[in-house]
């Protein structure tokens, strides 16, 4: 671990204790290059110390040294400025201080520092620019000033390096790769949620359609590339001036000025790339950025939860194929991470890397779409050639296959010598073809007429047939029986439909013989009273067919077998009943039927007039209902019985009815 040394030294007993505060002059912004060359994620520590023993606490910014990077003298810390801040107002500090943050919760921008470390280890001192050398010389002059300012102290004249690196030269590459692996397994964020101007690109920059701002950003960063492997190292520093990290819950404030780093320092790769296409192919987005689905260079296996080193990234890098372009990612959750990050205002540091455009991606997409369109065009042409047969309107599936089959069969017959062997082989293929086409859906589309009931019976769908037959009337069932043998068998299988059909046939036979079932309004109650001989003449009875009288022996209404004489009287009785029924159909609402006193034929009478008229033309007797004599009008009836009958008809509530009630 790096050791911390304070710039404040105590004098001996002769001198009083005093805190020496070294104020550094304002240097040009110097990025975190030399201070993080060999520092891994486990070697970072906080170098900001507060002198609490003094009356006024001061914030002392210490200098870090890394002597094993090929530099003659140690370099100065990336934050040469120093400010006095109180402990109370440290959370509100402006983002001009560059301090080394703590390792807790990955608050520092490790990704960029690790990229710089790997690049400096692989590169030589000759690959550095003149601006870097001027900055190093400036830092050396600063160190000399510090030594001169502290030379007056008697205790310590020589200053040792404040921070030393514990990483050896031979272990530098492996430790940096381990640091990359450890960093890739965590999520980092350099976006301040409290500020709106974060310098992030809009959503359109992440879409395949390039906007105006996106093209400008591509032009601005076209001279640099991102180091993705050890072979093609082209480090690129992408960032905005407003990128910073602020944590209100902690005391430590981590601010990383990136704009000055981009302005003053430029790194060149150790190997010259062949073309700009190789640079674009070498660009890749880490998995922890949440934009893995936008990269064209990653295969489906790399989209899984595989977290490896950058050597594994190089294995997966290559020219994508059409299958890879069409292939969709396995994990849709990573696709949903993009809008979530932009809504919350926190994105990974690799969002800056997404600002570099992939111009070759559009070419690749266009090429892939051209290949797919050519394939579809060839398929459509072949389909047109295949479907260019005639007479396919009836059965599109069957006739097409049969036509193709017969065409190949004729060719084989012409070439083959043994026709019998070929016929047997073709018969086997026909059987297999029929078995395949048996379950084909839509094989009979286009046919004008289709026997639906037969198709349902062929598929053994009896429940559907039962529903269809139940919805038909008895007459429709009788007609369906006479259509074909298949429909006759379908109706015969359904017992309920067959029973309805037989009943309908019986009714047709009864109508054909002229025997219609006639019923009166009150016949339902009188049919149960066959034993009442007094009302036998007026009971409504159904007429039996004429042909049945000669064949079957006649029976009385109560079930007794009648002799020929009795049967003749029964026939006379049935004729009387028929006459009553005919006259009853012509009655008005205020009329009733009564047998004529002379001929016992049905006669109409009116109860309020006490008058009846025989309906038989030969009789035509007009009689009084009370005395059954000829109608006498308003005169009293001649018989005494009429008087007695009149006395019986006592009006309710009259004096006679009251006397009768008293007598009772």
UniProtKB/Swiss-Prot annotation:
Zn(2+) 2 binds at residues 624, 627, 632, 637. GO terms for cellular component: female germ cell nucleus; nucleus. This is F-box only protein 43. Residues 1-98, 315-358, 637-664 are annotated as: Disordered. Residues 445-502 form the F-box domain. Part of a SCF (SKP1-cullin-F-box) protein ligase complex. Interaction with SKP1 does not occur. Interacts with ANAPC2; the interaction is direct, ANAPC4, CDC16, CDC23; the interaction is direct; ANAPC10; the interaction is direct and CDC26, during spermatogenesis. Interacts with CDC20. Phosphorylated on Thr-190 and Ser-289 in response to calcium, which is a prerequisite for ubiquitination and proteasomal degradation. Required to establish and maintain the arrest of oocytes at the second meiotic metaphase until fertilization. Acts by inhibiting the anaphase-promoting complex/cyclosome (APC/C) ubiquitin ligase. Probably recognizes and binds to some phosphorylated proteins and promotes their ubiquitination and degradation. Plays a vital role in modulating the ubiquitilation of CCNB1 and CDK1 during gametogenesis. InterPro entries: FBX5_43, IBR_dom, ZF_ZBR. CDD domains: BRcat_RBR_FBXO43, F-box_FBXO43. A zinc finger (ZBR-type) spans 592-640. It comes from the Eukaryota. Pathway: Protein modification; protein ubiquitination. Residues 328-337 have a biased composition (Basic residues).
């Amino acid at each position: 671990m790096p050791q911390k040394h304070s710039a404040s030294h105590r004098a001996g007993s002769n001198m009083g204790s005093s805190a020496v505060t070294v104020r550094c002059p304002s240097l040009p912004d110097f990025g975190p290059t030399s201070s993080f060359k060999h520092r891994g994620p486990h070697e970072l520590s906080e170098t900001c110390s507060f002198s609490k023993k003094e009356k006024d606490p001061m914030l002392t910014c210490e200098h870090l040294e890394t002597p094993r990077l090929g530099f003659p003298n140690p370099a100065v810390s990336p934050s040469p400025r120093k400010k006095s801040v109180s402990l109370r107002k440290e959370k509100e500090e402006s983002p001009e201080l560059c301090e080394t943050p703590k390792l807790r919760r990955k608050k520092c921008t490790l990704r960029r520092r690790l990229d710089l470390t790997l690049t400096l280890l692989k590169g030589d001192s000759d690959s550095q620019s003149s601006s870097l050398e001027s900055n190093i010389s400036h830092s050396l002059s600063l160190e000399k000033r510090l030594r001169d300012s502290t030379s007056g102290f008697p205790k310590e004249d020589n200053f040792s390096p404040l921070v030393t690196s514990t990483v050896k030269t031979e272990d530098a590459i492996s430790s940096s790769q381990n640091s990359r692996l450890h960093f890739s397994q965590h999520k980092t964020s350099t976006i301040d949620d409290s500020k709106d101007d974060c310098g992030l690109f809009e959503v359109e920059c992440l879409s395949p359609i390039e906007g105006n701002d996106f093209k400008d950003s591509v032009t601005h960063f076209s001279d640099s590339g991102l180091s993705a492997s050890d072979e093609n190292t082209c480090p690129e520093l992408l960032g905005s001036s407003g990128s910073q990290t602020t944590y209100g819950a902690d005391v430590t404030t981590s601010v990383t000025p990136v704009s000055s780093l981009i302005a003053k320092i430029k790194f060149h790769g150790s190997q010259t790339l062949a073309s700009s296409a190789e640079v674009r192919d070498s660009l890749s987005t880490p998995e922890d950025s949440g934009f893995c689905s936008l990269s064209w260079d990653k295969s489906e296996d790399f989209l899984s939860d595989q977290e490896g080193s950058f050597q594994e990234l190089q294995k997966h890098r290559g020219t994508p194929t059409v299958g890879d372009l069409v292939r969709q990612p396995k994990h849709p959750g990573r696709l949903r991470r993009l809008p979530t990050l932009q809504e919350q205002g926190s994105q990974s540091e690799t969002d800056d890397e997404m600002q570099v455009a992939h111009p070759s991606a559009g070419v690749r997409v266009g090429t892939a779409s051209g290949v797919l369109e050519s394939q579809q065009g060839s398929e459509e042409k072949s389909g047109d050639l295949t479907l260019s047969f005639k007479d396919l309107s009836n059965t599109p599936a069957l006739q097409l296959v049969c036509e193709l089959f017969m065409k190949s069969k004729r060719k084989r017959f012409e070439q083959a010598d043994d026709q019998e062997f070929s016929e047997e082989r073709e018969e086997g293929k026909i059987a297999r073809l029929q078995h395949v086409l048996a379950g084909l859906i839509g094989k009979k589309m286009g046919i004008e007429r289709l026997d639906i009931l037969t198709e349902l019976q062929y598929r053994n769908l009896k429940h559907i047939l039962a529903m269809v037959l139940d919805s038909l009337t008895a007459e429709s069932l009788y007609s369906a029986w006479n259509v074909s043998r298949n429909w006759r068998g379908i109706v015969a299988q359904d017992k309920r439909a067959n029973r309805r059909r037989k009943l309908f046939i019986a009714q047709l036979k009864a109508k054909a013989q002229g025997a219609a079932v006639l019923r009166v309004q009150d016949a339902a109650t009188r049919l149960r009273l066959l034993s009442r001989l007094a009302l036998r003449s007026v009971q409504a009875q159904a007429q039996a067919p004429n042909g049945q009288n000669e064949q079957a022996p006649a029976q009385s209404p109560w079930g007794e077998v009648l002799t020929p004489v009795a049967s003749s009287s029964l026939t006379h009785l049935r004729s009387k009943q028929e006459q009553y029924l005919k006259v009853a159909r012509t009655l008005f609402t205020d009329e009733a039927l009564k047998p004529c006193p002379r001929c016992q034929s049905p006669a109409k009478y009116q109860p309020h007039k006490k008058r009846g008229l025989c309906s038989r033309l030969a009789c035509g007797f007009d009689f009084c209902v009370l005395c059954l004599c000829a109608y006498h009008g308003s005169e009293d009836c001649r018989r005494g019985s009429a008087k007695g009958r009149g006395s019986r008809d006592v009006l309710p509530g009259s004096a006679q009815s009251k006397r009768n009630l008293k007598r009772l």
